[in-house]
Amino acid sequence: MTFISQAPSVSISSAGPSDYFALLKPRVMSLVIFTALAGMLIAPDPVHPIVGFASLLAIAVGAGASGALNMWYDADIDAVMKRTAKRPIPLGRVMPNEALAFGLTLSFLSVFTLGIVANWLAAGFLAFTIFFYVVIYTMWLKRSTPQNIVIGGAAGAFPPMVGYAAATGHFSLSSFILFAIIFIWTPPHFWALALGRSEDYRQAGIPMMPNVKGAARTRLEILLYTLLLAPLGVAPWLLGFASFVYGMLSIALGAAMLFFAARVYIVQEGPSADRHAKALFGFSILYLFLLFAEIVVERLVPIVVAMGAWLTSGMFPGFFH
């Protein structure tokens, strides 16, 4: 007689590396790296390259962990929405329990690594950021209030403050200004997208602003937030931690952002209304990228030039003198 032991069945998928990489939300992770780098570079003293690289890696992993935990919890609504139906869990390529374990493991590793290579203030704030995104936004706000993206958007705005804290061991007004720019940018960015996908959100039961307050109210709030964003984007120059070039760029970009937002508010019906909302969504990405790219470039170029001069003079002292 053959005895077969009965054990609890555990769902295990045949997921590959690309599936787990998709759980990290790489597009969001790249934005986190970029904004955290900007926060790190505005620190008054330069951070050691190895410490800086390791800190950015830890912050990126923390952002990826948040994405994995978000997909684990939102698997039910991801399967309903067209935009998210092809994510690894709805497709059955990654089991929910695997995504949960993956996200929790990366969360611990990212926080612990940042604490070791930088400092525990930055690590603690990274842990808080993960908690805020997963628990406050994903588990609570997202399904309960049309202000979900307003309050929850703080999680996506924290990386510059984490980067600054990793470089200095404290926070500053300058890092908070970068946080505020992303925080105020988030509602018009996501509501412009939500205007064209309100039916998708309705089917998933997510109370986005267009579904709860209507398209007209959403368009008005997009304009109001953009009116706040335009002068706020100039603040780094006015406060002295960004250059004149940044100041002129931020003024031009702010004016363009206002133009796109005003069109969304004025044209509320017909094919042009949807087209203007999509245009605002696309430009908002360019707006944030160019603002932070200018900060990164103007801080990195002197560092790269100085390192190049040091390397060439050290390696070929006779040739360059």
UniProtKB/Swiss-Prot annotation:
Gene3D superfamilies: UbiA prenyltransferase. InterPro entries: Protohaem_IX_farnesylTrfase, UbiA_prenyltransferase, UbiA_prenylTrfase_CS, UbiA_sf. One of its GO terms (biological process) is heme O biosynthetic process. It catalyses: heme b + (2E,6E)-farnesyl diphosphate + H2O = Fe(II)-heme o + diphosphate. One of its GO terms (molecular function) is protoheme IX farnesyltransferase activity. CDD domains: PT_UbiA_Cox10 (cd13957). Its EC number is 2.5.1.141. It holds the Pfam family UbiA. It is an enzyme of class 2 (transferase). It is found in: Cell inner membrane. PROSITE patterns: UBIA. Keywords: Cell inner membrane, Cell membrane, Heme biosynthesis, Membrane, Transferase, Transmembrane, Transmembrane helix. The chain crosses the membrane at residues 28-48, 49-69, 94-114, 116-136, 149-169, 176-196, 222-242, 247-267, 277-297, 300-320. It comes from the Bacteria. The keyword Disulfide bond does not apply. The keyword Cell inner membrane applies. One of its GO terms (cellular component) is plasma membrane. Pathway: Porphyrin-containing compound metabolism; heme O biosynthesis; heme O from protoheme: step 1/1. Carbon 2 of the heme B porphyrin ring is defined according to the Fischer nomenclature. Belongs to the UbiA prenyltransferase family. Protoheme IX farnesyltransferase subfamily. Converts heme B (protoheme IX) to heme O by substitution of the vinyl group on carbon 2 of heme B porphyrin ring with a hydroxyethyl farnesyl side group. This is Protoheme IX farnesyltransferase. It comes from Beijerinckia indica subsp. indica (strain ATCC 9039 / DSM 1715 / NCIMB 8712). The gene is ctaB.
